[in-house]
Swiss-Prot record:
The protein's name in its UniProt record: Protein-glutamate methylesterase/protein-glutamine glutaminase 1
EC assignment: 3.1.1.61, 3.5.1.44
Gene that encodes the chain: cheB1
Domain CheB-type methylesterase residue range list: 177-369
Residues found modified as 4-aspartylphosphate: 54
Post-translational modification, as annotated: Phosphorylated by CheA. Phosphorylation of the N-terminal regulatory domain activates the methylesterase activity.
Gene3D superfamilies reported for this sequence: 3.40.50.2300, Methylesterase CheB, C-terminal domain (3.40.50.180)
Length: 369
């Protein structure tokens, strides 16, 4: 039985979340709390497997409570977030502090979305409960070094704000010669923001190809996510726009609620941003991105699947590999949820399985050979 503590100042939200969770026979809400202080007391008392945590609360807010949880009794935490720019920024900060993921707070609307939210909530709680200490499994490991390297140092752009992420980019090693890839496509879901930041912040400003990322996120979150990454990375990061050219040294985040695809028109690489197909399970979809990269560039495409629930990306990687592309998967031990990477590993499609600390180096290696 998975034990959960629900922390929220709204009586409606406490009841709604508890009701949704306990519809799953494998989940028990052992306590609820009205603010961060009460939440810490209940966590100490019940030692839950998972905590759901509101952000805006009296007496002690969610970010303060989260800091205490991660320092004193680290465990998987799901933030309960409003789908606003402010809510997105606070939630992204929470994930930097150690929260695993978030769930939307707009549960009062009577619609079919409630059924999906309920199922997603239950699945997230069950998946992350297996990771007792979020982020702590990201163990340091020596970077992969190809033979006869030439150093390429990642230095922050002048406009980039100083940060621990930017200052830890270090030196990536690359073999000589020209790149053999023209795009890096990344698919990621639960646990993704810290993983994506770890990878992108270690790439050099003169990274030779464009990077396109399909991160499962609502529309209100992808813009702030791109802006936050742009402030801590040497490469430029922005939200993808329909029709824009794919440029070297730049990463493009697919807008929430839309798909992003790579198009190749006589060697001119552009991005297509569209809500179609409407029936896709995820928007953005890693499948749509990976398939488009493979079809557009064949063996000059690189697909990377990072932490996430489910198997989004599997069908797209199949196409990418059929066209001669290269595929990397994040390792089980460094994933928050080993779902999406597991799908391509189990299918025999991953050329390499890589710890998250080594992923930037692995991407650099694959781009050059």
């Amino acid at each position: 039985m998975i034990k959960v503590v629900v922390v929220d100042d709204s009586a409606f939200m406490r009841k709604a979340l508890s009701s949704m969770l306990e519809k799953d026979p494998g989940i028990s809400v052992v306590a609820t709390a009205r603010n961060g202080e009460e939440g810490l007391e209940q966590i100490r008392k019940h030692d839950p497997d998972v905590v759901t945590l509101d952000i805006e609360m009296p007496r002690m807010d969610g970010l303060t409570a989260l800091r205490h949880i991660m320092m004193e009794m680290p465990r998987p935490v799901l933030m309960v977030s409003s789908l606003t720019v402010e809510g997105a920024e606070a939630t992204l900060k929470a994930m930097e502090l150690g929260a695993v993921d978030f769930i939307p707070k707009q549960l009062s609307t009577v619609s079919l979305d409630i059924v999906k939210i309920e199922k997603d909530l239950q699945e997230k709680v069950k998946a992350i409960s297996r990771r007792r200490v979020p982020g702590r499994s990201f163990r340091p490991a020596p970077a992969v070094r190809p033979a006869a390297p030439a150093a390429l140092r990642a230095t922050p752009r002048p406009s980039a704000a100083p940060s621990s992420a930017a200052s830890s980019t270090g030196t990536l090693q690359v073999a000589g010669g020209k790149p053999v890839r023209d795009v890096v496509a990344i698919g990621v879901s639960t646990g993704g923001p810290p993983a994506v930041q770890k990878v992108l912040s270690r790439l050099p400003q003169d990274f030779p190809v464009g990077i396109v990322i399909a991160q499962h996120m609502p529309a209100a979150f992808t813009g702030p996510f791109a802006k936050r990454l742009d402030g801590v990375c040497a490469i430029a990061v922005k939200e993808a726009e329909d029709g824009e050219m794919l440029m070297p040294g730049k990463a493009y985040i697919a807008p929430g609620g839309k798909h992003v695809r790579v198009r190749n028109t006589r060697g001119r690489l552009t991005l297509e941003v569209s809500a179609e197909p409407a029936e896709a399970l995820y928007k953005p979809s890693a499948n749509e991105l990976m398939e488009s990269a493979g079809l557009a560039l064949g063996r000059r495409s690189l697909g990377v699947i990072l932490t996430g629930m489910g198997s989004d990306g599997l069908e797209g990687i199949k196409v990418l590999k059929q066209k001669g592309g290269h595929a990397l998967a994040q390792s089980d031990s460094t994933c928050v949820v080993y779902g999406m990477p597991k799908a391509i590993v189990d299918a025999g499609l991953a050329d390499s399985v890589v710890d998250i600390d080594d992923m930037a180096q692995a991407i650099m290696n694959a781009v050059y050979k």
